């Protein structure tokens, strides 16, 4: 889509609006099928991370993107039951990625290994990066491999890093938060080592990470 838009747009900039993206599964048992209430797991967190990385990587064209939907419907960020509320893994990905908003997108490239399933193949690592107004750099990454960790060496061309912090959201593909256990899947600190031009870390299987590099 972005290639077509860039090829044919004239003097006026044409934006791409991505409406109602997200996962759509069978509804939870014993719920009204018309309400589209579904559980939200680490699998959905990976879907959110991939999509948000794509949107950031194509932010010169993507002008708006709306997840379907925010509360209790489809790939919801929040689930409620009476007076109770639980934050889903998808919510935590949005929170970890919020530094991309209003920042300057940086070109990024990842050397990856393909994951093969039936006749489909996808990269095991998905990344995006942006620079904040204060000069810090946010790198977001998703490990799509649900059985193997990925050692990561990030090189930031032209940067002079002075420190790095990182958080990771990880768990089994079906891991999720419930009203009885609302913090089963939450971001935790990720051990990261600073290098002369970036950092190194290891992404757990089925995980989403956000690295903030100060310089």
Model-derived segments and spans:
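Generic recognition of flexible, low-complexity loop/linker segments
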Residues: 3-7, 51-55, 82, 125-129, ...
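Short helix-capping segments at alpha-helix termini
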Residues: 6-11, 60, 159
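Aromatic/acidic polysaccharide-binding cleft in carbohydrate-active enzymes
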Residues: 14-127
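Carbohydrate-binding surface patches
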Residues: 121-160, 166, 209-212
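Acidic, Ser/Thr/Pro-rich beta/coil linker or hinge segments at domain junctions
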Residues: 160-199, 203
């Amino acid at each position: 889509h972005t290639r077509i838009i860039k090829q044919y747009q004239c003097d006026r900039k044409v934006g791409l609006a991505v409406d109602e993206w997200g996962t759509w599964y069978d509804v939870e048992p014993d719920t009204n099928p018309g309400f589209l209430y579904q559980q939200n797991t680490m699998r959905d967190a990976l879907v959110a991370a991939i999509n948000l990385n794509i949107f950031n990587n194509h932010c010169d064209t993507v002008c708006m993107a709306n997840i379907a939907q925010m509360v209790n419907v489809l790939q919801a960020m929040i689930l409620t039951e009476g007076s109770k509320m639980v934050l889903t893994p998808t919510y935590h990905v949005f929170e970890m990625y919020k530094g991309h908003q209003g920042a300057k997108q940086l070109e990024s490239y990842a050397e990856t290994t393909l994951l093969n399933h039936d006749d489909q193949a996808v990269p095991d690592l998905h990344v995006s990066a942006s620079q904040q107004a204060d000069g810090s750099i946010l790198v977001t990454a998703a490990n799509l491999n649900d059985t193997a960790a990925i050692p990561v060496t990030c090189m930031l061309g032209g940067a002079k890093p002075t420190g790095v912090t990182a958080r990771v959201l990880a768990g089994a593909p079906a891991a999720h938060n419930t009203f009885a256990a609302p913090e089963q899947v939450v971001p935790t600190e990720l051990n990261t080592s600073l290098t002369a031009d970036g950092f190194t870390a290891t992404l757990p299987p089925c995980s989403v990470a956000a690295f903030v590099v100060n310089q």
